[in-house]
């Protein structure tokens, strides 16, 4: 390495020295500074590489040691927490990094099984919020303090308690049972009695309440129900109601052949199918019909009668079984010897009708009887059709009659709307027309009154004023005609001519004003007076009377005006005649 090297005249750039090798050129001179610098860089690079490798190896060893210790400590459940804490703290102190490695999380989730529910949780607890309810503390078996509702005996509810006399009356009412009541067991009564406030115990525990309820049920189960008509006794209330139907005079079922089955033999002994012919139950009624009024082909036991054919004892018709005979022939009302108006309750026949109406499959046993039921169904359909056709026709005829009667009965003033009041200038222009109209109306009214009297508004006004003065003395003068006595509607008396009616109405204005002055509020109307027809009638009558007054008032003024006009016309004519004579 200690060799002298000469350089050429043309100098070239020297390459950078590498850390591991030293390049020596023949043309370069020896430089100590560059050599030392390269050696120093090479040493530093070696130191850095060795230290990095050493650190990586130590980290891997530490991680393996931590995992081994963690697994061993998990097996020991009691010493797990104490053994892990110091080791982990030492590892953290030795290998602290600025950027830690991504590893498994230090948080672990422990799943614990759910505890089973206690049996006492499923039991109901008495809870009350009434007047006498109290919430009191008590200590349980574990010594813990708990709170529960209890009923404390007090005098708050004494006002609502029943006296002994009322309790006896209530018990007597309960014992009086009607035959129509349904069968109810004694257990339901025990349940009702157990739910009363008196049966709830004052203790907070649930076992004591169960014992009290069971004791009340046992006490009520020993109760006996006696029949008031005989000495029969029953433990179930429903049996008593069924028994009491025997003592009732009116039975639910009666034998239809009872009257025809009575006969007297040679020894003057009367024979009947039954003592009274009445039955309180359907099953006993049907057994009576099958045993007394159905003839079997051969003598047979009562248990085997349902499948044996036979004949009707009254009409002799043959049937495959007594059940079909009873349901269709007797209850269906097909036997000829049934009394008039007999209505049975045939369940089989009703089922057949429903099957035929809904077009369903018919039972093969009931096919022979389906023809009769089909005829009845068709008859019912025809009746419904006839009723609909006649009903629509009758309704239309009734509506037409009502419309005609309403047209004939309506007054003349109601067919035309009520006149509207006009100013005085327009009235003066149409006075002549009003006079002509009233004159024609007067002649027409006289002609109509000879044939029949029509209830015009003016006639109603005058008739009410003349014939019901006594009624108005006790009632309001504004009451309409419809609210008066119904006897006034039974006849329609003849009325005087139209103008005479108006004159009579004006003569009686003084009497009406005296009655109206007795009332403070003249505008107080009844409910019946709010009807539109009554308002139209009153307005029309008022306007007609007003027109008549205006005509009578303006007649003298019109006569004077006509006389003045005639005088002026005569003066003008005379003046015209005098003018040509002056020119001549």
Swiss-Prot record:
Post-translational modification: Proteolytically cleaved: activated by the amino acid-induced proteolytic removal of an N-terminal inhibitory domain.
Renumbered residue ranges of the record's region Disordered: 1-22, 161-214, 381-496, 553-584
Gene Ontology MF terms in the entry: DNA-binding transcription factor activity; DNA-binding transcription factor activity, RNA polymerase II-specific; RNA polymerase II cis-regulatory region sequence-specific DNA binding; zinc ion binding
Keyword list, A-Z: Cell membrane, DNA-binding, Membrane, Metal-binding, Nucleus, Repeat, Virulence, Zinc, Zinc-finger, Zymogen
Keyword GTP-binding: no
Phenotype caused by lack of the gene: Exhibits reduced capacity to take up amino acids and to switch to the hyphal form, and impairs response to farnesol.
Ranges of biased composition (kind: Polar residues): 1-11, 180-202, 481-496
Biased composition (Low complexity): 203-214, 394-407, 442-480
GO BP annotation list: amino acid import; cellular response to alkaline pH; cellular response to heat; cellular response to oxidative stress; filamentous growth; filamentous growth of a population of unicellular organisms in response to chemical stimulus; positive regulation of filamentous growth of a population of unicellular organisms in response to chemical stimulus; positive regulation of transcription by RNA polymerase II
PROSITE patterns xref list: ZINC_FINGER_C2H2_1 (PS00028), ZINC_FINGER_C2H2_2 (PS50157)
The keyword Endoplasmic reticulum belongs to this UniProt entry's keyword annotation: no
Domain of life: Eukaryota
Subcellular location: Cell membrane; Nucleus
A cellular component annotation (GO) from this entry: cytoplasm
InterPro entries: Transcr_Reg_ZincFinger (IPR051643), Znf_C2H2_sf (IPR036236), Znf_C2H2_type (IPR013087)
Comp. bias intervals (Basic residues): 431-441
SMART domains with a match to the protein in the record: ZnF_C2H2
Biological role: Transcription factor involved in the regulation of gene expression in response to extracellular amino acid levels. Synthesized as latent cytoplasmic precursor, which, upon a signal initiated by the plasma membrane SPS amino acid sensor system (including CSY1 and CSH3), becomes proteolytically activated and relocates to the nucleus, where it induces the expression of SPS-sensor-regulated genes. Required for efficient alkalinization through the release of ammonia from the cells produced during the breakdown of amino acids, and subsequent switch to the hyphal form.
Name of the protein: Transcriptional regulator STP2
């Amino acid at each position: 390495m200690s060799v002298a090297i000469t350089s050429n005249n043309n100098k070239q750039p020297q390459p950078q020295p590498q850390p591991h090798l030293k390049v020596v050129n023949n043309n370069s001179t020896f430089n100590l500074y560059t050599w030392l610098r390269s050696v120093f860089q090479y040493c530093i690079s070696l130191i850095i590489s060795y230290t990095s490798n050493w650190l990586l190896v130590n980290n891997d060893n530490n991680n393996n040691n931590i995992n081994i210790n963690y697994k061993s400590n998990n097996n020991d459940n009691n010493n797990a927490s104490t053994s892990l804490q110091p080791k982990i703290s030492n590892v953290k102190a030795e290998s602290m990094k600025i950027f830690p490695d991504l590893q498994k999380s230090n948080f672990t989730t422990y799943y614990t099984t759910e505890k089973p529910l206690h049996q006492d949780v499923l039991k109901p607890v008495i809870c009350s919020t009434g007047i006498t309810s109290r919430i009191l503390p008590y200590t349980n078996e574990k010594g813990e303090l708990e709170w529960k509702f209890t009923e404390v005996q007090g005098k708050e509810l004494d006002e609502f308690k029943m006296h002994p006399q009322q309790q006896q009356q209530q018990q007597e009412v309960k014992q009086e049972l009607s035959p129509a009541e349904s069968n109810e067991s004694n257990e339901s009564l025990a349940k009702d009695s157990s739910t009363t406030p008196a049966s709830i115990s004052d203790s907070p525990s649930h076992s004591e309440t169960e014992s009290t309820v069971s004791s009340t049920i046992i006490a009520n189960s020993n109760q006996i129900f006696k029949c008031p008509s005989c000495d029969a006794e029953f433990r179930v209330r429903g049996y008593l109601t069924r028994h009491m139907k025997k003592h009732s005079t009116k039975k639910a079922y009666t034998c239809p052949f009872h009257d025809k089955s009575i006969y007297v033999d040679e020894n003057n002994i009367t024979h009947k199918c039954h003592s009274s012919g009445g039955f309180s139950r359907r099953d006993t009624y049907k057994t009576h019909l099958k045993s007394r009024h159905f003839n079997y082909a051969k003598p047979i036991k009562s248990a085997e009668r349902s499948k044996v054919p036979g004949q009707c004892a009254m009409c002799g018709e043959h049937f495959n079984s007594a059940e079909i005979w009873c349901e269709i022939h007797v209850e269906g009302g097909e036997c000829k010897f049934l009394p008039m108006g007999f209505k049975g309750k045939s369940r089989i026949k009703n089922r057949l009708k429903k099957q035929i109406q809904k077009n369903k499959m018919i039972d093969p046993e009931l096919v022979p009887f389906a023809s009769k039921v089909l005829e009845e169904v068709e008859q019912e359909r025809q009746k419904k059709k006839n009723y609909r056709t006649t009903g629509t026709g009758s309704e239309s005829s009734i509506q037409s009659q009502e419309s005609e009667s309403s047209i004939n009965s309506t007054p003349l003033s109601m067919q035309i709307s009520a006149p509207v009041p006009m100013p005085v200038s327009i009235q003066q222009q149409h006075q002549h027309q009003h006079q002509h109209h009233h004159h024609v109306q007067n002649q027409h009214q006289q002609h109509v009154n000879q044939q029949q009297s029509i209830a015009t508004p003016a006639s109603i006004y005058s008739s009410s004023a003349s014939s019901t003065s006594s009624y108005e003395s006790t009632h309001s003068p504004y009451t309409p005609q419809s609210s008066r006595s119904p006897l006034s509607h039974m006849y329609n008396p003849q009325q005087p001519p139209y103008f005479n009616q108006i004159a009579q109405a004006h003569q009686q204005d003084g009497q009406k004003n005296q009655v109206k002055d007795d009332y403070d509020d003249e505008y107080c109307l009844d409910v019946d007076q709010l009807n539109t027809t009554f308002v139209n009638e009153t307005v029309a009558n008022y306007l007609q009377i007003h027109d008549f007054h205006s005509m009578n008032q303006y007649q003298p003024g019109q006569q004077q005006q006509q006389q003045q006009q005639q005088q002026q016309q005569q003066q003008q004519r005379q003046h015209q005649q005098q003018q040509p004579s002056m020119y001549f």
